[in-house]
């Protein structure tokens, strides 16, 4: 078993699920169990400054060259999604995959099928790592952690490979949008970085959604239903009117690529008051602004119909498209693309239909595009990762480091 796979299997066995309701950093103490292990392993690899700071793990592999090679960072996150259990993960190896259904769990008759996930057919003959159907796998982002750690281990075992300063960080709470909150950019020390938090092999991303959340509060008036005529105002029904007036063709289930959306992801309410929880996503700044304006204008329209004060919308920006911060330093994307091509991986440059620590970090002065881990179907029981993709990720990391060293040797 290759070292990246061995590391990955050890890391996924540690429960690191984050918790959006918590106000601590990290949001869950169990993330520190992995943090302490990674700190210890970095020190064993010779990164003597390895440390845990505010729940973040940092370490630096000093340059072994006197040339002016830029300091490169590699970042992955320790937490797994709150959307599905990460407790007692039992990873399963499926060797020489034959293209048929994979029985994840005989007891519950849970099957990973190419009928549902046709991308499985791309990996016939390969070894896959799956769940046992009762938890997520945690390739998001423990695969990234394992790949970075394996690359660092390779460099320390091969001092003849010339490199500049390599900075490593593992963050908590990325899955709940707080992964960059306490990130020490200055202390990290990199000139630029890469998150290793992407999906299938070849993914290379430097654009992401502009993101906001919207809370729509709808006020009603409750009276006894037996005496309610011309008196009751049912906030649930008013809320439904707001919902259906937003474009039904602009939801996550009906959009792809560079298309934006409105996503209603929670409703809580009764006759007296109903609250709608939306997220708003778009790549273009003008389209993003129009979406926010649409939600505000719709509330005004509903208030004109039902009376002032029944509808109130509060919109909070969450993160921005990092493209504007990456474009001035596109060499970091070009190097990653060349690294992939050199090791036999076809680059798949695509926008991130989501967020990433790299977006926030880019606006904090650390340009940070995103590299693939190799995983599929994150945040659920059908998550899987081909082992060869993890091995290729390690090769890409090492090749990026090598290309920068070569460039500054001339």
UniProtKB/Swiss-Prot annotation:
This is Peptidase T. Its EC number is 3.4.11.4. GO terms for cellular component: cytosol. Belongs to the peptidase M20B family. GO terms for biological process: peptide catabolic process; proteolysis. The active site is at 79, 174 (proton acceptor). Binds 2 Zn(2+) ions per subunit. PANTHER family: PEPTIDASE T. It comes from the Bacteria. Zn(2+) 1 binds at residues 77, 140, 197. It comes from Desulfitobacterium hafniense (strain Y51). GO terms for molecular function: metallopeptidase activity; tripeptide aminopeptidase activity; zinc ion binding. Zn(2+) 2 binds at residues 140, 175, 379. Keywords: Aminopeptidase, Cytoplasm, Hydrolase, Metal-binding, Metalloprotease, Protease, Zinc. It is found in: Cytoplasm. The keyword Aminoacyl-tRNA synthetase does not apply. Its main location: cytoplasm.
């Amino acid at each position: 078993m290759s070292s990246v796979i061995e590391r990955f299997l050890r890391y996924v066995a540690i429960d690191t699920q984050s918790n959006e309701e918590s106000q601590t950093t990290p949001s869950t103490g169990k993330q520190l169990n992995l943090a302490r292990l990674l700190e210890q392993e970095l020190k064993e690899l010779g990164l003597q400054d390895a440390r845990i700071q505010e729940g973040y793990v940092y370490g630096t592999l000093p340059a072994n060259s006197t040339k002016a090679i830029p300091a490169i960072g590699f970042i992955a996150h320790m937490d797994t999604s709150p959307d599905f259990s990460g407790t007692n993960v039992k990873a399963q190896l499926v060797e020489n995959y034959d293209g048929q259904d994979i029985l994840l769990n005989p007891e519950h008759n849970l099957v990973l099928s190419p009928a549902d996930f046709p991308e499985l057919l791309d990996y016939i003959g390969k070894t896959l790592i799956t769940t046992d159907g009762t938890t997520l796998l945690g390739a998001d982002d423990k695969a990234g952690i394992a790949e970075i750690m394996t690359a660092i281990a390779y460099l320390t075992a091969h001092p003849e490979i010339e490199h500049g300063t390599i900075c490593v960080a593992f963050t908590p709470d990325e899955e709940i949008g707080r992964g960059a909150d306490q990130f020490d950019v200055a202390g990290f020390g990199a000139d630029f970085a890469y998150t290793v938090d992407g999906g299938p092999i070849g993914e290379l991303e430097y654009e992401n959604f502009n993101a906001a959340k919207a809370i729509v509060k709808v006020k009603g008036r409750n009276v006894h239903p037996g005496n309610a005529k011309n008196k009751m105002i049912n906030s649930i029904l008013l809320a439904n009117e707001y919902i259906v007036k937003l474009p039904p063709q602009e939801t996550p289930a009906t959009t792809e690529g560079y298309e934006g959306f409105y996503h209603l992801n929670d409703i809580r309410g009764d006759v007296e008051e109903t609250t709608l929880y939306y997220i708003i996503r778009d790549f273009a700044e003008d389209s993003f602004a129009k979406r926010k304006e649409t939600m505000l204008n719709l509330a005004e329209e509903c208030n004109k119909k039902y009376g002032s004060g029944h509808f109130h919308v509060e919109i909070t920006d969450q993160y921005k498209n990092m493209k504007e911060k990456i474009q001035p330093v596109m060499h970091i994307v070009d190097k990653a693309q060349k690294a992939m091509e050199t090791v036999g991986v076809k680059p798949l440059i695509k926008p991130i239909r989501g967020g990433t620590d790299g977006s926030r970090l880019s606006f904090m002065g650390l340009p940070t595009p995103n590299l693939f881990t190799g995983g599929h179907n994150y945040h659920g029981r059908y998550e899987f990762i081909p082992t060869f993709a993890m091995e290729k990720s390690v090769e890409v990391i090492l090749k990026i480091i090598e290309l920068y060293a070569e460039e500054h040797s001339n």
